């Protein structure tokens, strides 16, 4: 409580992506277009799955949740980044900074757990197909989604508590375009070595353990595909390769950012742009371009809309 009472900083100032005004204007248009396409693409996937009965199965149930999380995840940081590209003084209040930090880790951690669950779903479907309907029924799927949100919330609460328990009495300049734990705790008026270790341990353990679980699942799947027919192998590889591309695009930046006690914020900003702006857009593109069922369902919905 004493640490909280010492807090005197009321707002933070972002340095942003660059200090070059011309580059900021040039960045604004493509980032705005990317964000709008992210919202549209992921929203279309959710709507398509909800209104297509034959897609009401575990794989697409999880995919719709992934699209929802991507919408939320990008919306936590991108609007503030776009605002900062147009303003000379990029500020955020202390309370809003902590809120942004909380929701950033909530959605990021929930996505990590969801991608791990999706890998397990594919493992059951391909390796033990006769038990799939019993193991992955809708009741279990709903329970898994509840568990991943609970896990994401607990992780985010831990990260947020470790951040706000520190005293902030200046400076208040964040070398980033959004509030995240590493750049924020650097501004604390006390030694943050132990806090940094705890934060890296929390995020790093989750990222690495889930990534190892994913790699293990796909390794077992690849070995089991030798027993499948040519058509079965083709369909399974198409689904799994799309999912693994999403995993690599998301886990790579997360492991890079959150498993190092010391960060280079100039490099971190580039990596952060990739996983907060680019990856949420690539997810719907990867799944729709490589998934005939989703593409066909979207065409049917469009035809129904035209006919009505």
UniProtKB/Swiss-Prot annotation:
Keywords, in A-Z order: Cell membrane, Copper, Disulfide bond, G-protein coupled receptor, Glycoprotein, Membrane, Metal-binding, Olfaction, Receptor, Sensory transduction, Transducer, Transmembrane, Transmembrane helix
Extracellular side: 1-24, 79-97, 165-204, 258-268
Known outcome of mutating residue 179 to S: No receptor activity in response to MTMT binding, even in the presence of copper. Little to no expression detected on plasma membrane
Stated consequence of mutating residue 105 to K: Decreased receptor activity in response to MTMT binding, even in the presence of copper. Complete loss of receptor activity in the absence of copper
Record note on what altering residue 300 to K does: Decreased receptor activity in response to MTMT binding, even in the presence of copper
Role, per record: Olfactory receptor that is activated by the binding of organosulfur odorants with thioether groups such as (methylthio)methanethiol (MTMT) and bis(methylthiomethyl) disulfide. Also binds odorants cis-cyclooctene and tert-butyl mercaptan. The activity of this receptor is mediated by G proteins which activate adenylyl cyclase (Potential).
Membrane-side (Cytoplasmic) residue stretches: 46-57, 119-143, 226-236, 290-308
Cysteine pairings via disulfide bonds: 97-179
Outcome after substituting residue 179 to A/V: No receptor activity in response to MTMT binding, even in the presence of copper
Outcome (variant: residue 109 to V): Decreased receptor activity in response to MTMT binding, even in the presence of copper. Complete loss of receptor activity in the absence of copper
GO cellular component terms, semicolon-separated: membrane; plasma membrane
Pfam families reported for this sequence: 7tm_4
Impact upon substituting residue 97 to A/V: No receptor activity in response to MTMT binding, even in the presence of copper
Domain of life: Eukaryota
Tissue: Expressed in olfactory epithelium, specifically in the olfactory sensory neurons of the septal organ.
Outcome when changing residue 210 to S: No change in receptor activity in response to MTMT binding in the presence of copper. Complete loss of receptor activity in the absence of copper
Protein name stated in the entry: Olfactory receptor 4E2
Resulting phenotype, residue 118 to A: Decreased receptor activity in response to MTMT binding, even in the presence of copper. Complete loss of receptor activity in the absence of copper
